[in-house]
């Protein structure tokens, strides 16, 4: 546990960074498009059994399409491709990167952290720290706060924050569970 003098403690909204700036943003979209209609087809038997109307998923979630990685591609491939673009757009040498944070919740393994593989594939310097922050949608904001704080403290010069997701395994599991005759 760490402590700070009471007069130095603020709220999360009080954080101000004086030396950190966003240099680039890049993305890599998965090539496969999966529609809500596809899930309706996969769940047609369940919808019929439970007397649910087709199109329910899109009406409830408001999502008509999602993207997924093609056969043989992984979310980590997308992370690396986007990171390469971001480094190039920022105009810095990767040897200057002192921190890599992966803010994805997707992972193929419990350990090692996704950041370890990304660090290696990007050929970042050995002295660059790397770790994952998995806090769902807030993970990226948390990562920006940690990286900016380390820059302000003078611990690093540049940080690279990455995130890439692949909900396909969760989708397959959900369809399998929902198609179980015992599901209600």
Residue ranges and their predicted role:
Residues 2-17, 48, 84, 88-94, ...:
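Acyl-thioester C-C bond-transforming condensing/cleaving domain
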Residues 1-98, 120-123:
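Conserved "HGTGT" condensation-loop signature of ketosynthase/thiolase-family condensing enzymes
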Residues 26, 104, 165:
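Anionic group-transfer/hydrolysis microenvironments
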Residues 99-105:
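Short glycine-rich or small-residue beta-strand-to-loop segments that form or flank ligand, phosphate
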